[in-house]
Swiss-Prot record:
GO terms for cellular component: cytoplasm. It comes from Phytoplasma mali (strain AT). This is Histidine--tRNA ligase. The keyword Ligase applies. Transmembrane segments: none annotated. The lineage of its organism: Bacteria, Bacillati, Mycoplasmatota, Mollicutes, Acholeplasmatales.
Length: 423
């Protein structure tokens, strides 16, 4: 019986891998120009990290993959990137310095969700975390970063939707008003939102079922309960977005799915329905309390994450993702006698070490059969070694496009091919 891949996962092969590599290359180039440094954290973390940072979220309560290791420690496959980056930031004592730390990451994440178009149980994200300062100008920098990155990749038909959750005192004031209002409307709540009312009531604003009901359209807005500091901070972000000519829209009902956000929160939305019913590429926001929650010194942060699968789907739709033909090689090496295999492999390795993409057949075959295999790789050149060439320390090189063929010494082989291939 054939063993198949687990539900909600997929394999990447051939041209698709090339497209992913092209995207990753562009993203790394872009982030490094913005002075972000790559960070890589384990795909496993202690489950406690996510319990501390997102206690009431669906991610922790329903979707997390976790298991006990052989010593009884509860381990989780990471469901998101921020908690692991912050854990690393604290563990490596970066919260003691006064530097601004700007990180980017690309990697795999895991959630036990119902698989559907654009949503998988193993998925990938491109993310940014900036730790070490609390200023609206940093919010603006991070939002501008994601906006400019998408433009750099060729996307234009998107906008940033933005809101503020205020500081801690503004949030507490609002959440009391919000809960009092919702409790009076609880007969209209769906079953999921009735559970949310007990734990993380603000997530009711994010419910697609309840969003269509009139009672939620009349809910009090957090922007009416901000203190002066929170209001001025958000006003500065909005003023900056206008000055930077970033396409945005204030959305007073926008909340994020994790508990640790405060102040600015945002999502990146496609204006056209490019990826099915879900038109969000990702989102992010500020977190002033997260470092402290995980045991570090009080440090502010802000970040965002984009779904890589969704991003690739959109880029492919608009033909914005270039890829090379992985099957095409520079040289296919043909040897005409089984006694010449060792010499042939020696020359092949010389070509490869010189940066020339080369393949050879590892079992001796008659010339026409070797040629048939070679043509599947669509090589730019054939390099041919026969008894006569070997005796004279020569090699035959044939251009597969114009069919020109010439003999030259084996010592000249690499120099000639590098010139011809413009390497």
């Amino acid at each position: 019986m054939i063993i198949k891949k687990p539900k909600g996962t997929y394999d990447l092969l051939f041209d698709e891998i090339s497209q992913w590599q092209e995207l990753e290359k562009k993203v790394k180039f872009f982030f490094e120009n913005y002075n972000y440094l790559e960070i890589r954290t384990p795909i496993i973390e202690y489950n406690e990290i996510f319990n501390r940072t997102a206690t009431h979220s669906d991610m922790v309560n329903k979707e997390i993959y976790n298991f006990y290791d052989k010593k009884g420690r509860l381990i989780a496959l990471r469901p998101e990137g921020t908690a692991g980056v912050v854990r690393s930031y604290i563990e490596n004592k970066l919260d003691f310095n006064e530097n601004l730390n700007k990180f980017y990451y690309l990697g795999s994440f895991f959630r036990y969700e119902r698989p559907q178009k654009g949503r998988y149980r193993q998925f990938h994200q491109i993310g940014v975390e900036v730790l070490g300062d609390n200023t609206p100008f940093l919010d603006l920098e991070v939002i501008a970063t994601v906006s400019e990155m998408l433009i750099f990749l060729g996307l234009k038909d998107f906008k940033i939707i933005i809101n503020t959750l205020g500081d801690e005192s503004s949030y507490k004031k609002y959440i009391k008003v919000f809960n009092d209002y919702i409790k009076k409307q609880d007969i209209f709540l769906c079953s999921l939102c009735k559970e949310r009312l007990k734990k993380n009531s603000l997530r009711i604003l994010d419910c697609k079922t309840c969003a269509q009901k009139n009672f939620l359209k009349s809910v009090p807005l957090i922007t009416d309960y901000l203190n002066d500091f929170s209001k001025q901070r958000f006003d500065s972000v909005i003023k900056g977005l206008k000055f930077m000519k970033i396409n945005f829209q204030i959305c007073p009902h926008l909340v994020r799915g994790l508990d640790y956000y405060n102040h600015t929160v945002f999502e990146i939305i496609l204006n056209s329905d490019s990826i099915g019913k879900r038109n969000s590429l990702g989102g992010g926001g500020c977190y002033d309390r997260l470092v402290e929650i995980l045991g570090g010194h009080k440090t502010s942060g802000i970040g965002f994450a984009l779904g890589t699968e969704r991003l690739i789907s959109v880029l492919k739709k608009y033909d914005l993702l270039e890829y090379s033909n992985n099957n095409q090689i520079d040289v296919y090496f043909l040897f005409l006698d089984s006694k010449l295999f060792f010499k042939s492999l020696f020359l092949v390795n010389q070509l490869r070490n010189a940066g020339i993409k080369t393949e050879i057949n590892y079992r001796f075959l008659p010339f026409l059969k070797q040629l048939k295999k070679a043509l599947k790789y669509n090589p730019k050149y054939f390099v041919i070694l026969g008894e006569k060439e070997d005796k004279n320390n020569e090699i035959s090189i044939k251009n597969t496009i114009n069919q020109n063929q010439k003999k030259l010494s084996q010592l000249e082989m690499i120099k000639f091919l590098k010139k011809e291939l413009d390497l």
